């Protein structure tokens, strides 16, 4: 029994190691093709690695660059967006994404956002969910320590310090917890997509015979509100809502 368990664990470890070695080899070859400007070969290898289940912002970023060099803007934007989900703080990813968006046909004015919301979003996007989670845990631990100082210290000055600084760390812990939760939900609940069709008509209902509302073009980002069979109800940045067939978009 124990021997069989050991063999099973050893086999699982071997599979993981060999799988990692395979992925590393493919990534190295893809990087070589990218450096040599052999973008089609690089794309195939990067896609192979990603389809195997391995994810990293660098992979999506390099793949996005390959598609961009090939003039395939929707695919470039899709992969830059996926890279940004994993590394929201990365300025290079954000710059290339904005550059790609500047070249798509549709120029939509987003709904106005209050300054405080923009400020919070800029702070929230300075790092990824795991980092925010660690900051939240560390801050809460410091809050507990300072709480003990407040309850058990006999010196008034230390009690005041423990109380007010403890409240500060509790606030930091709570805020960073919600930052981590937001970033994690974006990763898990992929509710945005990129239009891949050159032109698509947005309709009033999930029916090809329903009223035509407006037209979107390739490369634009849409928010997915709900799904009805093979149709998505989508919202664009200016607040307009409608339905498009799922074949026209790729989920980020």
What annotation goes with each model-predicted range?
Residues 213-246:
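SH3/SH3-like beta-barrel superfamily modules
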Residues 35, 195-224:
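Beta-loop motif signature
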Residues 158-182:
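Internal/C-terminal transmembrane anchor helices
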């Amino acid at each position: 029994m124990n021997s069989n368990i050991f063999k099973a664990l050893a086999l699982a470890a071997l599979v993981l190691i060999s799988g990692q070695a395979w992925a590393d080899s493919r990534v190295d070859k893809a990087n070589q093709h990218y450096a040599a400007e052999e973008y089609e070969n690089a794309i195939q290898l990067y896609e192979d690695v990603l389809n195997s289940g391995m994810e990293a912002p660098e992979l999506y970023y390099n793949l996005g660059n390959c598609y961009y060099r090939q003039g395939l803007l929707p695919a470039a934007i899709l992969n830059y967006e996926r890279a940004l989900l994993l590394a929201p703080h990365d300025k290079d990813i954000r710059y290339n994404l904005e550059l790609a968006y500047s070249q798509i046909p549709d120029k939509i004015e987003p709904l106005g956002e209050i300054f405080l919301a923009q400020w919070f979003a800029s702070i929230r996007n300075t790092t990824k969910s795991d980092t925010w989670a660690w900051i939240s845990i560390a801050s809460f631990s410091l809050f507990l320590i300072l709480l003990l100082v407040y309850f058990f210290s006999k010196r008034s000055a230390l009690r005041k310090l423990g109380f007010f600084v403890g409240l500060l760390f509790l606030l930091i812990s709570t805020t960073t917890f919600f930052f981590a939760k937001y970033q994690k939900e974006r990763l898990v609940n992929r509710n945005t997509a990129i239009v891949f069709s050159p032109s698509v008509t947005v309709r009033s209902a999930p029916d090809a015979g329903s009223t035509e509302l407006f037209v979107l073009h390739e490369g634009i980002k849409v928010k997915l509100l709900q799904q009805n069979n093979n149709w998505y109800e989508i919202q664009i940045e200016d607040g307009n809502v409608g339905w498009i067939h799922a074949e026209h978009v790729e989920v980020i």
